[in-house]
C-alpha cells in the first residue's frame, strides 16, 4: 500500500510540473529586439566583448580584445622591448611574424566583427528621434561601429596614406551575414567618418 501511495504521489508531483524551456535569467534574440531596453543589453554586450576573455583556437586565458589590440598595434612599433623569447603571441607581434592562426590575430578579427554585428542590430532596431534614450544608444552604436572598423582597418589594411584604392577590410554595415569582399581603403574610411559624424 505504501508503494502505491508513493507512486501515486510521485505521479501527481511530476504531472504538475510546468517545465520552463527558456531560462528566466536569459533573453532570446526576439525579446532583445523589442525595445530600447533590449538594445541597451546588446550595447552592454559589445562593451563586455571588448574587455572579457573569449575562447578562440582553444585559448581563453588573457584572450581579450584590448590586450591583443595593444599587442598588435604597439609592440611592432618599437614602443616596448622584450627581454627574451617567449611562446606568447605577443612575441610574434613584436617580431612582425603575425599569421592568421595566432590567437591574437584571430581574436581581434572575430571579436571586432561580432561587435560590429551587434551594433548593426541596434542601428536596424531603433528608430532615430523616438526618444532621447534611443538616440543616445544609436549614437553609441554608430560610434562603436565606426571605431571598430577603424581598429580593424588600422591592423588589417594598408594605411590610408598609401592610397584610397588599396584593399581594405570587409565593410559590414548591416546584419546580413552574407560573405562580403574586402572594400577599398577609401570606402572603409568614408564609412568610418560617416559613422563617427552620425554618432556626434
Residue map of PLM features:
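Bacterial Sec-dependent N-terminal signal peptides
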Residues: 1-27
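Membrane-proximal, proline-rich intrinsically disordered regions
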Residues: 17-66
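A structural signal for short, hydrophobic/glycine-enriched beta-strand patches
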Residues: 36-37, 52, 64-100, 109, ...
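Inward-facing hydrophobic residues that define packing positions of alpha-helical scaffold repeats
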Residues: 43, 116-119, 189, 196
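Secretory-pathway/luminal and periplasmic proteins that interact with or process carbohydrate-rich
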Residues: 52-56, 148-159
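Conserved, well-structured interaction surfaces
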Residues: 84-155, 178, 183-186, 200
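Short coil/linker segments at helix-helix boundaries
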Residues: 155-194
Amino acid at each position: 500500500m505504501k508503494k502505491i501511495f508513493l507512486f501515486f504521489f510521485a505521479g501527481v508531483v511530476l504531472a504538475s510540473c510546468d517545465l520552463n524551456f527558456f531560462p528566466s535569467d536569459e533573453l532570446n534574440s526576439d525579446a532583445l529586439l523589442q525595445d530600447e531596453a533590449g538594445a541597451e543589453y546588446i550595447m552592454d554586450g559589445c562593451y563586455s566583448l571588448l574587455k572579457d576573455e573569449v575562447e578562440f583556437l582553444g585559448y581563453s586565458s588573457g584572450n581579450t580584445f584590448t590586450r591583443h589590440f595593444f599587442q598588435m598595434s604597439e609592440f611592432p612599433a618599437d614602443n616596448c622591448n622584450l627581454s627574451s623569447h617567449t611562446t606568447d603571441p605577443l612575441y610574434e607581434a613584436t617580431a612582425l611574424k603575425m599569421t592568421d592562426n595566432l590567437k591574437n590575430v584571430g581574436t581581434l578579427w572575430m571579436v571586432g566583427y561580432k561587435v560590429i554585428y551587434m551594433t548593426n542590430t541596434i542601428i536596424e532596431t531603433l528608430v532615430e528621434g523616438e526618444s532621447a534614450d534611443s538616440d543616445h544608444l544609436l549614437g553609441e552604436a554608430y560610434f562603436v561601429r565606426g571605431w571598430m572598423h577603424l581598429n580593424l582597418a588600422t591592423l588589417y589594411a594598408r594605411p590610408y596614406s598609401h592610397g584610397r584604392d588599396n584593399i581594405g577590410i570587409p565593410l559590414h554595415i548591416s546584419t546580413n551575414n552574407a560573405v562580403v569582399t574586402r572594400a577599398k581603403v577609401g570606402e572603409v574610411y568614408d564609412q568610418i567618418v560617416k559613422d563617427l559624424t552620425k554618432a556626434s
